[in-house]
């Protein structure tokens, strides 16, 4: 574990969706240090709040080196002559709540997540780790099928849809450490769930799936009820909506326990 992640865990600083070692490496974020602070940097931005190497406290006053922070942490506020700008939401979920999905607030998702698997005979669909499919079909074969799922998913977005972090998405799809795949008995891939984690949260990175009615709901249900996820006893940071109103509505129907506004902060001139 690198210095920044170690300090966050030691100080029990609650991280945001961008915090994991796997994401740092796959996105090209660089860890830097000065005499006082450790911080993550990429493309001219300090990505998240710098943290003091001695005290473990996050930066609380801008200085000549730190004049902006791209994405804040929960409860992190920069006082003084500063301004902030909305970046995205963060949706936090409790995986335990997906085991029962009780109450009227769950009615829509509870109904919709059952619709996709009802189209198939019992036992036809399987949800397995990527390693199992590699053993059954071979690495090259599965990687080609994963690429096709990605192509189909991108095509379903429409020509005017902006895909953020598409290069990072491909790295996770082909080389992610935590991937589980929904497939049929012939190895046809319907969707892929991809995640990583930090000391506080499991980060649900990507759901890449075919454009089939109610498949997205079923993929989320499979992820949240998976014994691997349940056994970690962690909350899940499901990321934001990247300006997509449909995605925001979709996530709100899953009854998040927290919806946080993530902001960028700037020092006023």
Regions found by a protein language model. Name each.
Residues 178-268:
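Aromatic (often tryptophan-rich) hydrophobic motifs at membrane interfaces
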Residues 76-85, 252-260:
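Conserved acetyl-CoA-binding loop of GNAT-fold acetyltransferases
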Residues 32, 59-71, 92, 126, ...:
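A structural signal for short, well-ordered beta-strand segments and their strand-loop junctions
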Residues 52-62, 108-112, 163-167, 218-221:
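Well-ordered, non-membrane alpha-helical segments in soluble/globular domains
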Residues 141-188:
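Short, conserved active-site entrance elements at the starts or edges of catalytic domains
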């Amino acid at each position: 574990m690198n210095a920044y992640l170690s300090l966050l865990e030691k100080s029990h600083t609650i991280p945001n969706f961008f915090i994991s070692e796997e994401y740092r490496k796959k996105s090209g974020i660089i860890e830097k240090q000065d005499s006082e602070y450790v911080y993550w940097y990429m493309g001219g931005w300090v990505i998240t709040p710098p943290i003091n190497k001695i005290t473990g406290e996050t930066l609380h006053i801008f200085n000549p080196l730190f004049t902006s922070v791209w994405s804040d942490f929960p409860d992190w506020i920069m006082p003084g002559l500063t301004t902030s700008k909305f970046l995205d939401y963060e949706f936090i979920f409790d995986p335990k709540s997906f085991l029962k999905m009780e109450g009227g607030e769950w009615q829509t998702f509870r109904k919709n997540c059952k619709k996709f698997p009802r189209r198939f005979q019992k036992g036809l669909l399987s949800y397995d780790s990527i390693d199992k499919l590699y053993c059954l079909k071979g690495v090259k074969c599965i990687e080609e099928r994963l690429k096709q799922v990605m192509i189909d998913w991108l095509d379903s977005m429409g020509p005017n849809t902006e895909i953020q972090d598409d290069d990072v998405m491909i790295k996770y799809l082909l080389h992610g450490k935590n991937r589980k795949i929904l497939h049929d008995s012939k190895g046809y891939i319907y969707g892929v769930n991809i995640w990583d984690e930090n000391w506080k949260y499991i980060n649900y990175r990507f759901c890449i799936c075919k454009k089939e009615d109610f498949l997205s709901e079923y993929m989320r249900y499979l992820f949240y009820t998976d014994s691997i996820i349940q056994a970690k006893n962690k909350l899940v940071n499901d990321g934001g909506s990247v300006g997509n109103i449909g995605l925001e509505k979709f996530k709100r129907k899953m009854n998040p326990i927290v919806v946080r506004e993530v902001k960028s902060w700037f020092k006023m001139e």
